[in-house]
Amino acid sequence: MTMKEITVVRYGYRLVNSDWAPTVDVDDLGGFVSSLHNDLYSLGITVNYINEPDKELEVKGYADLLNIIRLRSPKDHIGNLCLGHIIGQSENCDLFEDIRRGVTRIAFAPEMIEPEGSNKVVCHNCGCGC
């Protein structure tokens, strides 16, 4: 069986709003992605994690936090889309839940993701250009 590979990438970030902070420890992302990998492996999907701290973005709130998480899936021609582009608006502002939604959307319904460079305005309005 040919495995589908999905990579979760975390960029570095700088909090610029003293009134807001993430409600989860973003450093726990590697363990969470490992758990996702274990859940999806038997279905022919591998999920990997890469930390790219040198690519640093400003984070003012939750929508910006979605922008530091990038998903890649070469088999689906998804090069480096931000999480918000893939899931749209977050339902519960739960980062790990949103990452799971994004990964499973790529895994099982990549045709539902707006193509990179499309003219659609994404409702989370993170400013990433998608």
Model feature map: region roles:
Residues 1-54, 63-130:
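Non-globular targeting/processing and membrane-anchoring segments
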Residues 57-58:
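N-terminal non-catalytic structural scaffold regions of very large proteins
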